[in-house]
UniProtKB/Swiss-Prot annotation:
One GO process term, biological-process aspect: alpha-amino acid metabolic process
Species of provenance: Ancylobacter novellus (strain ATCC 8093 / DSM 506 / JCM 20403 / CCM 1077 / IAM 12100 / NBRC 12443 / NCIMB 10456) (Starkeya novella)
InterPro entries referenced in this protein's UniProt entry, alphabetically: Cis-3-h-L-Pro_dehydratase, DgoD-like, Enolase-like_C_sf, Enolase-like_N, Enolase_C-like, HProlDhtase, Mandelate_racemase_C, Mandelate_racemase_N_dom
EC number of this enzyme: 4.2.1.171
Function: Catalyzes the dehydration of cis-3-hydroxy-L-proline (c3LHyp) to Delta(1)-pyrroline-2-carboxylate (Pyr2C). May be involved in a degradation pathway that converts c3LHyp to L-proline, which would allow S.novella to grow on c3LHyp as a sole carbon source.
Protein name, per record: Cis-3-hydroxy-L-proline dehydratase
Active site: K165 (proton donor/acceptor), K265 (proton donor/acceptor)
Pfam families: MR_MLE_C (PF13378), MR_MLE_N (PF02746)
GO molecular function: hydro-lyase activity; metal ion binding
Cofactor(s) the protein requires to work: Mg(2+)
Catalytic activity as recorded in UniProt: cis-3-hydroxy-L-proline = 1-pyrroline-2-carboxylate + H2O
Length: 367
């Protein structure tokens, strides 16, 4: 089997809440997502999706996905899509960096492998380690009381895990954490995610001020070294995200005891092949993970569900149902949240089928 063509569609994903705010005044109102098809000479097509969180979260941006596909796409024509390690080594050899560009090609090839073998992707990633996956809800940055009201609403929908978007004014962030923790049950989980928005001094102060609360601190500062400094000064459980972008940074962080949990975003590390490797390293080292992506719709959510379902429950800290945040359905067969959980399809591959009437005409055609 050989890859014969690649297509990509641009699709807007408006938000039910209207706007998503995070640290340093960043926000998105309509996410720009790219749906990718990898076509083969066997008549089997695999699908994937990549949706960066704006252009200020990681070294990635929405237009870059499609520009990158124009660059790397012709160089994977003729490769066997089921030889996933060979494919990934080739992509790394012809385009340095840009893992988010390579991710949808890799994921679409996992979809192909599942369709060829007649197995769901979670079986290929290790099997059904858990039947349903616990979800968290991200709470867009607003005034403390407004965030607390949103948590109360989502708690009524079945969520028990919440990621609070902080990384603004330090005093307000302390209030955000305190006010929201007060309305949660003792068994509920609260993560204060600064998305690199604090200085080291601010992070140290905030961690000390909320030291009496049951709260996780996530990615307080921009650099690994700053985060490591804050980690050494707090007893609060610690999550790293933005600075864990591959096997190398993961291994260093494990050696340095830099975190208790990592946030494993599939497109950030280059797709399912590399995410599976990092997942397995985390399991072997006893490190739980939030398994998710930067953003997306139905196809991203399906991809998350397959990796999370194949991860042992004790190492699956949480995952994300991004398709419940938006107003547009782009694929049939995607996971749907039930009482704060989701699961992956048992159909071959990712178990989804794009809704082409929504996608329209492709904006990238290669091959």
């Amino acid at each position: 089997m050989k890859i014969t063509g690649i297509k990509a569609w641009k699709v807007g994903l408006p938000l039910k809440e209207g706007r998503y705010n995070w640290s340093n005044g960043n926000f998105v109102e309509v996410f720009d997502s790219t749906v990718v098809a990898v076509e083969t000479d066997a008549g089997i097509t695999g699908y994937a999706e990549c949706c960066p969180l704006g252009s200020a979260y990681l070294p990635a941006y929405a237009h870059g996905v499609r520009a990158g596909l124009e660059e790397i796409g012709p160089k994977v024509i003729g490769l066997d899509p089921t030889d996933l390690n060979v494919l990934n080594r080739h992509m790394d050899s012809v385009l340095r960096g840009h893992p988010y560009v390579k991710a949808p090609i890799d994921i679409a090839c996992w979809d192909i492998l599942g369709k060829v073998s007649g197995l769901p992707v979670y079986k290929l990633l290790g099997g059904a380690a858990q039947e349903k996956v616990a979800l968290y809800r991200a709470i867009s940055q607003e005034a403390p009381e407004a965030m607390a009201r949103k948590i109360a609403g989502y708690k009524a929908e079945g969520y028990t895990k919440f990621q609070l978007k902080v990384g603004g004014d330090a005093d307000q962030d302390i209030d955000r954490i305190r006010v929201t923790r007060e309305i949660l049950d003792a068994t509920d989980t609260l993560v204060a995610d600064a998305n690199t928005g604090w200085t080291r001094a601010e992070a140290a102060r905030i961690a000390a001020e909320v030291g009496d609360l049951d709260v996780y601190i996530e990615q307080p500062c921009p650099t690994y070294e700053e985060c490591l400094s804050v980690r050494a000064r707090t007893a609060r459980p610690f999550v790293l995200d933005e600075v864990i972008d591959g096997v190398g940074t993961l291994m260093k962080a494990l050696a340095d005891d830099a975190m208790d949990i990592i946030n494993l975003k599939i497109s950030k590390v280059g797709g399912l092949t590399k995410a599976r490797l990092m997942r397995d390293i985390c399991v072997a080292s006893g490190t739980p993970m939030t398994i998710e992506d930067t953003w997306g719709g139905d196809i991203v959510t399906a991809t998350i569900a397959h990796l999370a379902r194949s991860t042992p429950e004790e190492f699956s800290f949480s995952a994300t149902d991004f398709n419940s945040y938006g107003t547009v359905d782009i694929a049939k067969g995607a996971p749907k949240r039930v009482n704060g959980f989701m699961t992956a399809s048992d159909a071959p591959g990712l178990g989804i089928e794009p809704i082409f009437e929504v996608l329209g005409e492709p904006v990238v055609v290669i091959g």
